[in-house]
Regions:
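C-terminal capping alpha-helices of c-type cytochrome domains
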Residues: 105-137
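Short cysteine/histidine-rich zinc-coordinating motifs and their immediately flanking basic loops
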Residues: 77-84
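Bacterial N-terminal signal peptides that target proteins for export
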Residues: 2-12
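N-terminal signal peptide c-region/cleavage motif recognized by signal peptidases
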Residues: 21-23
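Stable alpha-helical elements in mature extracytoplasmic
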Residues: 47-50, 64, 100, 104, ...
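Short microdomains enriched in Cys/His and/or Lys/Arg
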Residues: 87-102
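Electrostatic cytochrome c docking/interface patches
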Residues: 27-59
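The canonical Cys-X-X-Cys-His
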Residues: 60-72, 128
């Protein structure tokens, strides 16, 4: 009986610790930290108005960021070709937005290549994120 209780306690502790580790990993960065990183790489702070213009402008092709994320990135968007629903991009409306640097890097790389036919510069990322952070309920 003692071994059973000891084993049950070990399983419970591991389950709790595993859940805490998963939560910590899911939010390993913040939008403000991402903005700081890209601003430093760009050598200038992110500019919200420049980010708004960039976000809504078609960049030589058929699409803009707003084509999928919506002109109001405070609401759900919809992928222009697949129709897949996209969560709000503005951090105040989606607490998970910009909290996983690997996902952020992956999606910026993919989406910038779709919209611009190249990767976004650090300044462009900083501007867009400054704009998204500026959007409040």
């Amino acid at each position: 009986m003692l071994n059973f209780l000891r084993r049950s306690l070990q399983i419970l502790v591991l389950t709790i610790l595993g859940g805490m580790a998963t939560q910590a990993m899911a939010a390993e960065t913040t939008p403000a930290q991402q903005l700081s990183q890209w601003s430093a790489a760009a050598g200038q702070p992110g500019r919200a108005e420049q980010g708004r213009v960039f976000f809504n402008a078609k960049q030589g092709g058929e699409w803009s960021c707003a084509s999928c994320h919506g002109t109001a990135p405070t609401q759900q968007g919809k992928h222009a070709s697949t129709g897949k629903v996209i969560k709000p991009l503005a951090p105040a409306f989606n607490p998970q937005a910009f909290t996983d640097s690997a996902r952020v890097d992956k999606w910026f790389r993919r989406n910038c290549k779709d919209v611009l036919s190249r990767e976004c510069s650090a300044a462009e990322k900083a501007d867009v994120l400054a704009y998204l952070i500026s959007l409040k309920p």
